[in-house]
Design a protein with these regions (language model features):
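His/Asp/Glu-enriched, well-ordered alpha-helical/loop segment
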Residues: 38, 59, 64-66, 71-147
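Short acidic, glycine/serine/threonine-rich loops at helix termini
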Residues: 5-9, 27-32, 76-80, 153-155, ...
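Histidine/acidic residue-rich metal-binding segments in metalloenzymes
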Residues: 1-66
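A short acidic, glycine-rich active-site loop
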Residues: 39-49, 86-90, 163-170
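C-terminal cap of metal-dependent C-N hydrolases
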Residues: 81-84, 137-207
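Short, electropositive alpha-helical surface patch
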Residues: 3-18, 73-90, 122-127, 202-218
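Cysteine/selenocysteine-centered motifs that mediate thiol-based redox chemistry or coordinate metal-sulfur cofactors
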Residues: 213-232
Length: 232
């Protein structure tokens, strides 16, 4: 009902925005059937019909942004009775890979995912970022959409481990993030803190999407570079 109301108001020209988080387009209430506290969140997970409605809203533009809803908790807050456990899960490390599952399943285009996770959030909040135009802040994430992996604790940078996605097969991942033109995160690549002017084609197989910055990547290889806003 909330999505239908949002869709109706947008069709009327009302300036409203909506966001969702990856767990709402990936999981259903069945994930909490065994009282797994890592599946306890607020709002709670709903039915398969609700999940399908969220997916449709992502596809048709009713939902403007995908946010992580990152909510780290200690073991003490989660390893207890379901009723007493804290709400929320971590989402920084799993948000992009889960978004890439929608691309792999042909539900979203790479460009639409970029809008949902970078350009739209920056535009809605009125903050710099979400753009690869000349003069924009050099915040970039390099993505390998072909680098599938099984999500494990080794992929988590947060101190907290409260995620329901351990063991999930992911179709792709972020392999490098630049902030202000400096490398701040890399997965199996070079050492940190190289400048943006470095010719990355010698180090990173991939292509850049979209491109305007002085970064050279081979377009015939598999990879995407997108603004880093909301992908960290």
């Amino acid at each position: 009902q909330s999505l239908e109301l949002m869709r109706m108001e947008k069709n009327r020209g009302v300036q409203v925005t909506a966001e969702t988080a990856p767990h709402y387009f990936t999981l259903t209430e069945d994930a909490a059937a065994g009282y797994d506290t890592n599946a306890k969140m607020n709002p709670p997970l709903r039915s398969e019909a609700d999940r399908a409605a969220v997916l449709q809203a992502l596809v048709d533009g009713t939902i403007d942004a995908i946010a992580t809803d990152h909510a780290p908790h200690s073991c003490l807050e989660k390893e207890c009775e379901f009723e007493l456990a804290a709400n929320g899960i971590i989402g920084l490390e799993s948000a992009l890979p889960l978004g890439l599952t929608l691309v792999a399943d042909d539900l979203l285009s790479p460009g639409r995912l970029v809008e949902l996770m970078t350009a739209n959030p920056a535009r809605i909040l009125g903050i710099p970022g979400g753009s690869l135009q000349p003069g924009a802040v050099a915040d970039i994430t390099i993505i390998r959409p072909d680098q599938s992996f099984t999500f494990s604790e080794a992929d988590i940078c947060s101190k907290s481990r409260n995620t329901p996605f351990l063991g999930f097969q992911m179709p792709g991942r972020a392999v490098l993030t630049m902030v202000g033109g400096e490398i701040r995160f890399e997965k199996g690549l070079r050492s940190r803190h190289h400048s943006l002017s470095t010719d990355l084609s010698r180090h990173i197989p991939g292509w850049i999407f979209p491109t305007s910055l002085p970064v050279t990547l081979h377009t015939e290889q598999a990879g995407i570079a997108v603004p880093a806003a909301q992908l960290a």
